[in-house]
Structure formats: C-alpha cells, structure tokens
C-alpha cells in the first residue's frame, strides 16, 4: 500500500542517516529494480542526497570508475553482484556497503523458499550490512526532510551518449516531477488504482521516471519484475492483467508471438508503450494487429526521448497515434528541427537535427562542463535546447514528428 511505502521510505531514510548520509552526498547503487531500491530513491531525496545508478552487469573495473567519479562513501548493491562490488570498492572512497537480496521483500514462506533454492554463498567483509540489519540501525533516528529544492540532483544516470565517452546525466527533482505532471496533464488513459507492470531497470532514466515516479504520482499500483525473463513476459501479463506497461520494442514483439496469449482477451490493456530503442514500421504493424485482434482499444504507444530529458519528450498514445510517428511533445516541452550545428530552425517537413527544450531537461553532465555545453545550448529564445547529434528528424503540420 502507499501507506506502507511511506513507512518504508522513512525507515530507509533513518537508516541512511544512521550511516552518516547527509545533504549533498552521493550514494552508488548497483542493482536491478527492487522495492528496496525504490525506498532508497525517495529516502535519499528526503535527506537531500543523490543516487548514482550503475548497471549491475558492469565489470568490477567499470563499477569502480563510476564510484570514483562521484566519490561515494556508501555503496548499496544486490547480493549476486557483491563479489564484483567488493573488488570495485577497494582503494576507493567507499566506507560502508549495504547488501540487499531479492528475498528481502518477499513474504516469509517465499523468502525461505528463495534462500533454499538460491543460497547466498558470499563471504562479506566487516564493513558490510545486510538490508535488514541496515534498517535496524536506523531505529531511534527521525530525519526531517530537507526543504524542497527543484534543482537538487536526485539521480546520476550513466549513458554512452551521442558524443562518445560515457557521461553521468544529472536529473533533478524538477525533471522527475515535471515529467509526471506532463503525463498527468496529457493522458486520460491513466487512472488511480490501475496496475502497471514495471520490467525496466533502475539504472536508465526510462525505468525510474516512467516506471516508478510517474505511476506513483498518478496513484497506480506498480508490479515490479526485478529480472525479467522475456520468455515469461506473456505469462506475467496474463497473470497480473496490468493496464499499463513501459518496455522496449522487443518486449511487445515477444508478446505478439507468445502462444500462451493466443485467443486470450486482452481488453484490460489501456496503454502499453515502447521506448528505449528503435521501432521498425513492420514491428509496429505486427504488434498493432496483435493488440487489435485481442480486444485492445488502442495501438502500441511510443515516443521519443533521451536520458538527457529524463526519458520522454514526445508521445504517441491513445487516439493520437500515427503509424511511424513518435507523436507530439509533452506539455510545456518544445521540440523543434534545426539545421545541424546551427540555431536555424527548419520549416515543417524538412529533415534536420532534433532539439528539445522543456522542464525535464537535465542539469548537465556530472563534472563534464565542456560536454554539457556541447549538447545544452542557449538559443535566441532564451531557453536551453538539448541537441541530439547524429539524428534525423522531420516535423509535420499537426505537430507530429518522425525520427530515424
């Protein structure tokens, strides 16, 4: 329940405070999406701290680089990646490590079953706290929320970017809140109490902004799948019957080909959206035929965005969904097509470089001002525009946009 979520966030905030976390600190998190990671996201924000989100598939050396970049004193990781994280944290600023397990949020019977089938064979160092011991350490602490600062960096999300080297994208509280409000203002498809299936990881902006924060703001019930087996996606959809899902195009191609869903009534689906990767016209048509044949009212939703704008900037959903288009801009978001490497806006129908300006625009790249200045440029209108280099976009008369 939402009441329990608030309780868990406060307990996590107390535990973080007990470990000395304070405003301005950056906590590195190496994990898939779990309830504990969600609690940590909001608990850190309550204290004015920031999460540095790292893909658990990285090597020990890769994890070390991201730890060193932000100088984290606290590392939170999934138990299955602890050996790599232990190696990564050596000779870094890390002082304490908190280890979580997929069993931490399971009911007792399931947790026991999980531990029997997936025993934890790690040998933990003396600076490690398991999640339950970590939470227990917070007893007696009652942290007060820091005053709301819209420009507070709540997460650093890493991306290879379009200009070469990996970069840490700083997304603010305002970015996440604005995106949630943009969806709320634009879409009539989301209603309090509906279910959303979250199959996206926390270390991409799409996973947190669209998969966690936006649905919570709208009062949705989120079903978290920490480590999706694509072969079981159809079974999950049929079991939980979620009205909403955010995924990548291959997820929906998998659903369309799943024999389990043959002849099933899927009319409970309201808005299944594809992002995070390219969607071919043929794949879109295949998925749309599947949805229509199974009683779904609307075709596959899709959009366009970048990590640098907290994931989505345009959306094609519901009845406003043209085949092959990435849709229209979200509320308060300006999407324009410019002559490459210039500030010259192109007429409707001409191809050029896509530029995005709006409330979800990143604060910048962490400790990389030169790279930030390359992609965030102040145009004559006085706004910062996020340039997407190497893309090919075209705007149409009804504000629809295609991107290749």
Predicted features and spans:
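Gly/Ser/Thr-rich phosphate-binding loop
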Residues: 243-247, 256-323, 334
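Conserved adenylate-forming
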Residues: 16-22, 139-151, 156-198
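Short hydrophobic alpha-helices that are characteristic scaffold elements of the AMP-binding
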Residues: 42-47, 69, 204, 213-217
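Conserved ATP-dependent adenylate/AMP-binding module captured primarily in the ANL superfamily
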Residues: 58-92, 179-197, 229-243
């Amino acid at each position: 329940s939402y009441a329990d979520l608030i309780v868990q966030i406060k307990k996590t905030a107390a535990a973080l405070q007990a470990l000395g976390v304070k405003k301005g600190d950056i906590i590195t998190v190496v994990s898939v999406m779990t309830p504990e990671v969600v609690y940590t996201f909001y608990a850190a924000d309550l204290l004015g701290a920031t999460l540095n989100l790292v893909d658990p598939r990285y090597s020990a050396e890769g994890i070390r680089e991201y730890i060193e970049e932000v100088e984290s004193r606290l590392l939170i990781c999934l138990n299955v990646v602890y050996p790599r994280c232990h190696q990564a944290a050596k000779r870094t600023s890390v002082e304490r490590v908190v280890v979580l397990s997929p069993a931490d949020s399971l009911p007792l019977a399931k947790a026991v079953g999980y531990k029997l089938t997936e025993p934890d064979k790690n040998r933990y160092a003396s600076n490690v706290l398991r999640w339950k011991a970590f939470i227990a350490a917070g007893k007696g602490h009652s942290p007060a929320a820091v005053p709301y600062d819209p420009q507070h960096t709540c997460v650093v999300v890493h991306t290879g970017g379009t200009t070469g080297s990996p970069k840490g994208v700083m997304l603010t509280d305002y970015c996440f809140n604005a995106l949630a409000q943009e969806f709320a203002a634009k879409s009539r498809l989301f209603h309090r109490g509906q279910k959303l299936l979250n199959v996206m990881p926390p270390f991409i902006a799409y996973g947190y902004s669209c998969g966690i924060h936006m649905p919570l703001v709208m009062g949705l019930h989120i079903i978290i799948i920490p480590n999706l087996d694509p072969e079981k996606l159809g079974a999950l959809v049929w079991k939980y019957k979620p009205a909403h899902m955010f995924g990548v195009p291959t997820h929906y191609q998998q659903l369309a080909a799943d024999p389990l869903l043959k002849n099933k009534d899927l009319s409970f689906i309201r808005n299944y959206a594809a992002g995070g990767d390219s969607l071919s016209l043929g794949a879109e048509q295949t998925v749309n035929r599947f949805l229509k044949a199974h009683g779904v009212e609307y075709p596959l939703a899709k959009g366009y965005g970048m990590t640098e704008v907290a994931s989505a900037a345009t959306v094609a959903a519901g009845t406003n969904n043209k085949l092959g288009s990435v849709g229209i801009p979200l509320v308060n978001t300006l999407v324009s097509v410019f002559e490459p490497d210039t500030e010259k806006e192109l007429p409707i129908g001409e191809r050029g470089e896509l530029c995005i300006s709006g409330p979800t625009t990143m604060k910048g790249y962490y400790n990389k001002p030169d790279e930030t200045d390359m992609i965030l440029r102040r145009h004559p209108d006085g706004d910062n525009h996020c340039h997407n280099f190497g893309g090919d976009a075209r705007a149409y008369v009804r504000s629809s946009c295609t991107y290749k």
